[in-house]
């Protein structure tokens, strides 16, 4: 099989031939149709992600890519509910089933995870071995191209908005509203929560996309006075930060209303400012970090997409061989919505 392999952190992926994985008990071999291109893939390529999760550092070479949809081609023993030719979306956040977090249904925080494309081989190759069939979900109405970004951008945005505790009476600011996660978040915030949405993005293309998806107000330069004006003087009830830079975490928390929630998803180096900590009590603020969603979140966001309530905004389709180009586009800020690789 052909795959894009990471041999050394910080270097481009290499297109190579490798053996098709062998299938064991409870495992499934999937032919990859499409793989989404995520900022996490960039972080894996550079190795930066393992500064935060050093216990999950992989042995190289590694096939990266964790937003994976494709077709079942081989099933191991004791696999139930699937057959060859089923079209599936794979939940890449695979737990060992035995740690505390798996037992409470938060497998994505497993102490000994098998994260596809992060510490075990993922979707930038013609075939991927799913270590546990329970982390696969059949597709009914969705194409594999449309479905693939749901595995990370969809479920992560869904979880962040759930943690924000939104309803139609509340407002939410989405930072990075034109990106892969932000564009899904705008749709969820509007369709499911009915909230007033302020979309923030640095690109005009991203702002146009957020507007088309239902954002009520968009801007590339946040003005505190204007934000308070459009939120009846209170400020925003929630901020979903898909960037998480020093600039966003330092400058936007002051826009929170009393009892507001700041949900940090992005990992671009920003931390909680000292002043924010001092004001937690008087304002009743909550600062929440989230990695991604659990299997319940995964099922719910997939159902939303199957029913046409949300749709990943795929703005560019590239070949497997163009994986480095796709990652470079993302790194240079040239992408709104989501890029996907057509693998087979």
Curated annotation (Swiss-Prot):
Family annotation (InterPro entries): ADH-like_C (IPR013149), ADH-like_N (IPR013154), ADH_Zn_CS (IPR002328), GroES-like_sf (IPR011032), NAD(P)-bd_dom_sf (IPR036291), PKS_ER (IPR020843)
UniProt keyword annotation of Metal-binding present: yes
Q: Which family does it belong to?
A: Belongs to the zinc-containing alcohol dehydrogenase family.
Cofactor(s) recorded for this entry are:
Zn(2+)
Q: Which Gene3D superfamilies match?
A: Medium-chain alcohol dehydrogenases, catalytic domain (3.90.180.10), NAD(P)-binding Rossmann-like Domain (3.40.50.720)
Gene symbol of the encoding locus: adh
Concerning Pfam families, the annotation shows: ADH_N, ADH_zinc_N
Name it: NAD-dependent alcohol dehydrogenase
Keywords (A to Z) from UniProt: Metal-binding, NAD, Oxidoreductase, Zinc
What is the top EC class of this enzyme, as a single word?
oxidoreductase
PANTHER family cross-referenced by the UniProt entry: ALCOHOL DEHYDROGENASE 1-RELATED, VACUOLAR PROTEIN SORTING-ASSOCIATED PROTEIN 11
